[in-house]
């Protein structure tokens, strides 16, 4: 199960990075097109949809890598058992919140699929496609919260602490 989850997080991160590169590619294409005197319709629409995929698909990977912003001021002033309880509370709260968002994003994507909703803009892209990417990213993010919750519950450190420790020591 560990390998499957790690592959999911890594896969989402890779796909998010690919969409980030695609944003750069379509924007450069538009800039050079305008320089040469021809407009390219729909590039802004594509860049916006690629941004949705980049942002949501990268959430779980960056969380596991310890790249999300965390405020540890309170945790450092607690005893070790209190730190563990606070960590567990934050992880289960985050999992619940992300689960809520995942459910409603999936419901919205399903309704868009059923009704054939299309983007308003120069490119009438089916809305369930970017909404589906957002749902997949949120699902992976929810799983990463639950994954770390299970780890902390078993007495291990969460992935984001392990990742930042390795990086600080220059081994990452």
Residue ranges and their predicted role:
Residues 1-172:
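Alpha-helical transmembrane segments and membrane-interface helix-loop junctions
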């Amino acid at each position: 199960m560990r390998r499957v989850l790690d592959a999911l997080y890594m896969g989402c991160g890779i796909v998010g990075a690919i969409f980030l590169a695609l944003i750069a590619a379509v924007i450069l294409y538009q800039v050079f097109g305008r320089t040469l005197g021809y407009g390219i319709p729909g590039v802004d629409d594509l860049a916006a949809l690629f941004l949705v995929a980049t942002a949501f698909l990268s959430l779980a990977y960056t969380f596991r890598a310890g790249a999300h912003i965390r405020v540890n001021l309170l945790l450092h002033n607690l005893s070790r058992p209190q730190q563990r309880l606070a960590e567990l509370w934050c992880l289960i709260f985050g999992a619940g919140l992300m689960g809520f968002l995942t459910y409603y994003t999936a419901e919205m994507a399903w309704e868009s699929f059923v009704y054939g909703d299309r983007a308003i803009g120069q490119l009438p892209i089916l809305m369930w496609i970017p909404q589906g990417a957002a749902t997949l990213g949120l699902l992976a993010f929810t799983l990463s919260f639950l994954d770390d919750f299970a780890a902390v519950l078993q007495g291990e450190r969460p992935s984001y602490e392990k990742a930042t420790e390795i990086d600080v020591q220059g081994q990452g």
